C-alpha cells in the first residue's frame, strides 16, 4: 500500500563540546572542529526537541532552564555579555540567563546575531517557565496545561523545580490527568 509520509516532527542536533578534556584550549568556537560528539532529539515541536537534545548532552542540564545552576551568570553582567557575544559552548545557557536578567529577545539578538525565530521560541519557553513558577501548586495544572507544557519539552524534573515539589509528585499528578509519555513512529 502506498501512502504519503507526513512530516510531523522536528529533529534538533546539538554538538557536545568537552574543552575540559583539552587543557590549555580556549573554549571559543571558531571554524575549527572542536565538538566531541552530538546529541540528536526528535519531537513534535522545535521546543520539545531542543529540550530533549539539551538533556541528551550529558552535561547536567535538565533542559533549557530550571537547572540547578540557573542564575550563576547574573552576578557578573560583563561576563554574561561576553558569554552572549563570543561563540562558546555555554552560549545557549547564557541566553536563558539573559532572559532572567530582563533582556528582551531583540537585545539578545543584537549581541548574538541569532535568528529571531529561535529567540522567540526560547522566549516562549522562558515565559512558560515563569508561568509554571507562578502557580500555587501542581493541582493548578489541568490536562490541557499538562499537554502544552509537555509539547514545549519540559520534563518532570523541570516542572518539579518550578513548583518546588518532588519529581515523584509531578509524575503522580501528570498521570492523574492521564498525560503519559508516548512513542511515535517516524514515517518517511
Pin down the residues of each PLM region.
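ATP-dependent carboxylate/acyl-activation modules
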Residues: 1-188
Amino acid at each position: 500500500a502506498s501512502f504519503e509520509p507526513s512530516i510531523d516532527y522536528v529533529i534538533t542536533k546539538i554538538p557536545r563540546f568537552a574543552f575540559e578534556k583539552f587543557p590549555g584550549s580556549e573554549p571559543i568556537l571558531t571554524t575549527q572542529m572542536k565538538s566531541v560528539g552530538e546529541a540528536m532529539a526528535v519531537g513534535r515541536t522545535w521546543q520539545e526537541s531542543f529540550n530533549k537534545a539539551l538533556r541528551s548532552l550529558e552535561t547536567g542540564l535538565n533542559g533549557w532552564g530550571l537547572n540547578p545552576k540557573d542564575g550563576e551568570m547574573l552576578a557578573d553582567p560583563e561576563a554574561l555579555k561576553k558569554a552572549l557575544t563570543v561563540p562558546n559552548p555555554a552560549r545557549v545557557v547564557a541566553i536563558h540567563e539573559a532572559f532572567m536578567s530582563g533582556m528582551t529577545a531583540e537585545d539578545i539578538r543584537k549581541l548574538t546575531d541569532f535568528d529571531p525565530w529561535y529567540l522567540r521560541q526560547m522566549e516562549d519557553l522562558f515565559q512558560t517557565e515563569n508561568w509554571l513558577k507562578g502557580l500555587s501548586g501542581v493541582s493548578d495544572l489541568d490536562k490541557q496545561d499538562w499537554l502544552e507544557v509537555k509539547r514545549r519539552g519540559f520534563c518532570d524534573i523541570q516542572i518539579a523545580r518550578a513548583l518546588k515539589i518532588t519529581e515523584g509528585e509531578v509524575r503522580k499528578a501528570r498521570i492523574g490527568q492521564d498525560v503519559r509519555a508516548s512513542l511515535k513512529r517516524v514515517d518517511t
